[in-house]
Amino acid sequence: MNLQWQKYPENASKLFKLTVPIFISQLSASGMGLADIVMAGLVSDDDVSAIAVSNSIYFPLFLFVLGVLNAITPTVSYLNGANQRNLIAHQIRQGFWLVWAFVIPLIVVFLNSHWILDYMNTPAVFAQKSQDYLAIMAIGIVPALLTVNLRCMNDGLANPKPAMRITFIGLLCNIPLNYIFIFGKFGVPEMGAVGCGVATAIVNWSMFLMMFHYCYTNKPQKDIGLFNKWFEMPSGKTLLKICKLGLPIGFATFTEVMLFSTSALFLSPLGSQVVASHQTALQTSSMLFMVPLSFGIATTIVLGRVLGQKLVEEAKIISYHALITGVIFAVIAAILIVLFNNIIPLAFTRDPVSIAIASHLLLFAAVYQIPDSLQVVANGILRGYKHTKPVLYVTVFCYWGIGIPFGYVLARTDWIVQPMAAAGFWLIFCVSLSLASGLLIYQIRKIQKIPAATLIAKLERIK
């Protein structure tokens, strides 16, 4: 197809204006996790491992619900582009019902995490810390998801700056709170890894109150009328539409995260050094992943608005410009990892064995930067088109059909080669992400071949 390079600067500018605040917001959120790992590492590798194993349970479930709620963003963006802002408040109110529907079972899981930890043969030396950490995180998940719902509205309105400011403030608060609760300052008992959970719960509640205050007082959003009603009965029709779009996103997010998170659980019997080095490489890769992830979210917002304006050909051009820009970011990230793979682990641990393992794993992380960037931007494009079911099918096949079983085989068994430990999972990460990126781009090409009138009619039915 004609990529219309003369439009690239204009389209890149649209995307960058949204990407920068989204990136800062994502980076701040990821920075909280990084601060937890780094500060817990000053206590012991056992505390780092406790957080790593806890996060392998917490984040897949949290991100599943986040994925479902993310269906609200392209819907709001589409309604905003179609000049139907009066329909937006209803979507957000129904989003609150979804939050409560999911949050109660999540709390039950977190309060009974010992069943999962026992099943995975997690070493007793940090299993109890993981249980206590998750019990505290159960307190903070309610405000975290309520904040996501309000953030999705602002993102859909192409207004990501409030979330950027609030999340950055959350990061600034998280670090001193970690210091107080991890090391036991100002009369607070020393909690180690569990202190990270206490700090995170406090920060989550604070961020929700700030986001609520912004949405309540922001004059440009008054016409939406979100707070004209303080209570609205659940609408089966609207909730079904959100779930039809959001559940595939949620399950796709869950399957991808599980590819990474279950690796920590399967590696935990190999000891603290292996888990800590694996977590070091994973945390570094996750920080760099924030750029294409933010770009993918920005692409969803722009495409939703453009499709709401019925500009189907313009949406095609923006899609491919976004993919190309994602590759550029990935190449830069890969080069940085290769150049500094021996230095990066020093920020996480002082153990020489953990440093050596992490340095090796980071080279695998460099390899998969391009396919990982392509798949996340492609995900954003398909969400903008509200074409989410194929994303689920691709991710389940690539990450659960290939990634998890073959990662386990390479890491823990001698069925194919001698056990590769963490490197076995990282090799499969590269394979799974490469396959997923190719299949998702194929899905983009497929939906863009649909006649414009047919595509718009489909989008109107599910708005």
Curated annotation (Swiss-Prot):
Membrane disposition? Multi-pass membrane protein
Where does the sequence pass through the membrane? 20-42, 57-79, 96-118, 133-150, 162-184, 194-216, 245-267, 287-306, 318-340, 355-377, 390-412, 422-444
Q: Name one Pfam family in it.
A: MatE
Q: Where in the cell is it found?
A: Cell inner membrane
MF terms per GO, please? Answer: antiporter activity; xenobiotic transmembrane transporter activity
Per its UniProt record, what NCBIfam families does this chain match?
matE
Indicate the principal place this protein occupies in or around the cell. membrane
A single Gene Ontology CC term: plasma membrane
Q: Which UniProt keywords are given for this protein, alphabetically ordered?
A: Antiport, Cell inner membrane, Cell membrane, Ion transport, Membrane, Transmembrane, Transmembrane helix, Transport
User: What's this chain's function?
Assistant: Multidrug efflux pump.
Q: Which family does it belong to?
A: Belongs to the multi antimicrobial extrusion (MATE) (TC 2.A.66.1) family.
List this protein's GO terms for biological process.
monoatomic ion transport
Q: Could you confirm whether the keyword Flavoprotein appears in this record?
A: no
Q: What is this protein called?
A: Probable multidrug resistance protein NorM
